[in-house]
Amino acid sequence: LIDSSGGMDLLLTGTWLWMAAMLTWRVSLRRDLVFLAVGLVGGGVIEWWGTHTRIWTYFTLERPPLWILPAWPIATLAIDRMARMLDRSLDQVAGGRRVPSTWFWIAYWVSVPSFVVAMIAFARHTVDIGATQVVTALMVGVTLACRDPRRDIVLFAAGSFLGIFLEYW
């Protein structure tokens, strides 16, 4: 958060303060423990994939770096809270009426497969590596397993929003 040259990283500080605030809203131990586990495992898979294929590296050159893994469960909980806030506000914005489910089906089947295609294009130079094949199969499998497009597209939107700030940092 504080650079040794004396400067403070305001984007990182603000992002972590936002995530800390999200952690205090609607706490449910049972639900949160599941999300913490999913975040840790999912983050571990993502970091394993990215560092083993050398799509990205960290200054420590660890593959994956253990110090980054605790950020994933925290971000997962924050995304869950943000998604629930967004979900509640959607119906309010629609004048108190429930947003039609077809809108979410359309949004899901346009946005999420487009994201998967973009990720495959991003990793195109590593498609011959087993890690990329595993992650591609996971992305396609999760995409096809959608049972609640409203929940999933709201989670996708919240995760994308928070991810922009985390990645920009």
Give the positions of each predicted feature:
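Aromatic-rich, lipid-facing transmembrane alpha helices and their immediate juxtamembrane interface loops
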Residues: L1-W169
